[in-house]
A protein has these predicted regions:
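N-terminal Rossmann-like dinucleotide-binding module
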Residues: 2-46
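An anion-binding loop in the catalytic cleft
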Residues: 2, 217-316
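A residue-level signal for conserved active-site and pocket-lining positions in enzyme catalytic cores
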Residues: 14, 35, 58, 86, ...
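Acyl-group handling in specialized metabolite and lipid biosynthesis
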Residues: 206-218
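Donor/substrate-binding cores of folate-linked one-carbon enzymes
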Residues: 7, 28, 85-204, 211
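Glycine-rich, highly charged phosphate/nucleotide-binding loops
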Residues: 64-74
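N-terminal beta-loop-helix "entrance" segment that forms/cooperates
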Residues: 41-59
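Short amphipathic alpha-helix with an adjacent loop that forms part of the alpha/beta core around
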Residues: 72-82, 101
Length: 316
């Protein structure tokens, strides 16, 4: 049976670190004939053109990589590989209908939530932002609707209070890999798991844009604490301090306050506290403009921390 599965021609589509363990398991189990990923991006202050984690993984294994700017215009190259199955995990573009109907074993997506909850582009971030205590992975057959296809398998996982987008993404990636490894041989043998989603229970997420990353101190401290976790390690939440943008990496919820939201109400040895809707947000780790990320305690070694007291953040 394993020999037959090793002959299964797979096209894998994915982009971020989340997708890498899934690709690596497919390389071991099947014949990955092509990897499709997003085009290389300029990274850092020097704007160095950098491949996605998935592309880097595929190249290291000697597997051909295809990085179309517009998949809907270039999909025929993929179909020319004659895949038996297409598997996607956080790829980043809509897969056209012509691809969905081609493979004998269908198109399967590894999605970072318990569908139908959190369909769309940011399921992992959304679960943290909303303060959820549980989330999971869903394997589903793809169709034209966004994350609307029938469910093959799903598994739940706890969200730790300290989880960030980075740590939870890593846990879900391993869970997705293990679920796919367990399920793929059964799909290959022809068993059918089709469980329709209940559209009445569906919730939707959107791609997080640059303008969405600023902390809004009119919200509760708990909401902002979860927001910081959800955007760490990328793209990172930010604040404006006397016209300078600082990234915020680590926070906790402080004491209740009636001060104006956005006001720095306390400056401590290793943190500073900002008034929110109900209580303070204690900011403990930052990345000031033009500097590396650091604990606030270390930042204060070369900064007049008393000058922060009373500053109203996010004022242009």
């Amino acid at each position: 049976m394993s020999k037959q599965l090793k002959d299964l021609k797979v096209v894998f589509m994915g982009t971020p670190e989340f997708s890498v363990p899934i690709l690596e398991s497919l390389i071991e189990l099947t014949d990955v004939v092509l990897v499709v990923s997003q085009p290389d991006k300029e990274v850092g202050r020097k704007r160095v053109l950098t491949p996605s984690p998935v592309k880097a993984c595929a190249v290291s294994h000697g597997i051909e990589v295809f990085t179309p700017k517009k998949l809907r215009e270039e999909y025929e190259y993929i179909l020319n590989k004659k895949p038996d199955i297409i598997i996607t995990a956080a790829y980043g573009q809509i897969v056209p209908k012509q691809m969905l109907i081609y493979p004998d074993y269908g198109c399967i997506n590894v999605h970072g939530s318990l569908l139908p909850k959190y369909r769309g582009a940011s399921p992992i971030q959304s679960a943290i932002m909303n303060g959820d205590e549980k989330t999971g992975i869903t394997l589903m057959y793809m169709e034209e609707g966004l994350d609307t296809g029938n469910i093959i398998h799903a598994k739940e996982i706890d969200i730790a209070p300290t989880d960030t987008y980075g740590t939870l993404s890593e846990k879900l990636s391993i869970l997705g890999r293990d679920l796919l490894v367990k399920t793929l041989p059964v799909i290959f043998e022809g068993e059918n798991f089709d469980i329709p989603q209940n559209d009445d229970e569906a919730t939707h997420t959107v791609k997080i844009k640059r303008e969405d990353e600023r902390l809004d101190f009119n919200k509760t401290a708990k909401e902002l604490h979860n927001f910081v976790r959800a955007l760490n390690p990328t793209p990172l939440a930010n604040i404006l301090v006397n016209g300078e943008e600082w990234k915020v990496l680590e926070t906790e919820v402080g004491e209740s306050t009636t001060d104006k939201p956005g006001t720095v109400v306390a400056v401590n040895k290793d943190s500073f506290e900002v008034a929110c809707k109900d209580s303070t947000l204690v900011i403990k780790r930052i990345k000031p403009a033009g500097k590396k990320e650091m604990n606030v305690k270390d930042f204060f070694n070369g900064f007049n921390k008393d000058s922060l007291k009373g500053v109203i953040l996010n004022e242009e």
